Amino acid sequence: MAQEFVNCKIQSGKVVVFIKPTCPYCRKTQEILSQLPFKRGLLEFVDITATNNTNAIQDYLQQLTGARTVPRVFIGKDCIGGCSDLLSMQQNGELTARLKQIGALQL
């Protein structure tokens, strides 16, 4: 169930972030990504606490990405990590390049 839930969210050409609304790093990640000109429907924040499977989802994220912490940011089908990884990519210009590469931004 958790595996199915996560796998159906992760899609090429889309950015998906698994979050918990009370997490300050999740809020920072949302703030960073929400400032970018995404094409409609290509940025999704998934609140894992809205399901009854929060622990199972985090266990599957651990299996999939090597970490069960949130946020877990997927650019296309690739997990780039969490908030600090996103900040690092933003600072070195890699974030915009990757988002353009998957066609997620309005140019």
Swiss-Prot record:
Disulfide links within the chain: 23-26, 79-83
Residues recorded with modification N6-succinyllysine: 9
One annotated GO biological process: positive regulation of cell adhesion molecule production
One GO cellular component, as annotated: neuronal cell body
Subcellular location: Cytoplasm
Residues with the N-acetylalanine modification: 2
Keywords: Acetylation, Cytoplasm, Disulfide bond, Electron transport, Redox-active center, Transport
Matching Pfam families: Glutaredoxin
Matching CDD domains: GRX_GRXh_1_2_like
Alphabetized InterPro entries for the sequence: GLR_AS (IPR011767), GLRX1 (IPR047185), Glutaredoxin (IPR002109), Glutaredoxin_euk/vir (IPR011899), Glutaredoxin_subgr (IPR014025), Thioredoxin-like_sf (IPR036249)
GO MF assignments: glutathione disulfide oxidoreductase activity; sodium channel regulator activity
Annotated Glutaredoxin domain residues: 3-106
Protein task: Has a glutathione-disulfide oxidoreductase activity in the presence of NADPH and glutathione reductase. Reduces low molecular weight disulfides and proteins.
Annotated family: Belongs to the glutaredoxin family.
NCBIfam families with a match to the protein in the record: GRX_euk
This protein's name: Glutaredoxin-1
